[in-house]
C-alpha cells in the first residue's frame, strides 16, 4: 500500500507474469514505476477498492479482471458471471475517480496467446506433456487460427498442471519481444500516466538495445548519448526511432 499506485488482480498467473513481462519488455520493474501488484484471490475487488477514495487512500488503483467470454460464442455460466462482474465494477468506477477497471475479453491465458505470443506458449508444451501424441496435438491446436481450438488448448494445459504452475513455466519463455496484452498496458498507463524524461530515456534505451543487430537502429546510439547529455530532446529521439522502424 506504500507504492504510488496499485494494480489489483484475482489470479496467480497475473501476479506472476505481469511483473516479468514489464521487466523483460520495458527494462524497468514495477517497483521502479512505483506500482504494486496485489492478488486479491477470493477477497473481492469491491472490498479492497473502497480503500482508494478522496477520504481514504488517494492513489490510483487499477483492477484487472477477466470477462470470461465463451470461446464458442455461446452463453455460459462463466460468461454470465463476467457480465455481472463488469456491470458492478463499471458502476464502482463511475463514482470513484481513483479507480480504473480493465478487462481481459476472455481469460488471461487466452488473451496472452492472442496478443501475438504464440511462440512463448508453444515453448511450454513439452514442459506440460511427455506423450508424443499429446505434444503434437497441442502444437497443432496452438498453431490453429480458430480460437475454439487454441483457446481450449491453452486452458487445458493451464488447468492440467494448475494455472499458477503454468504461469511459472511460461515465465521461463518471456523475452523482450513478448507482447504485453493491451488491457494490461492500459491498466499500467492508468496508474502511471506520467513518466520522467530520465525514466522514458531508460526505457527507450532498453527497447533500442533489443534491435542492436539492426544497422538502422544502431545509428540511434549516438543520439541516445546526446539525449542523456541534454543536447537532444527526447521527443526528437522517439520520432527518429519511429521513422527508422517504418522504413
Task: Write out the residue ranges for each language-model feature.
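Acidic, divalent-metal-binding catalytic cores of TOPRIM
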Residues: 1-247
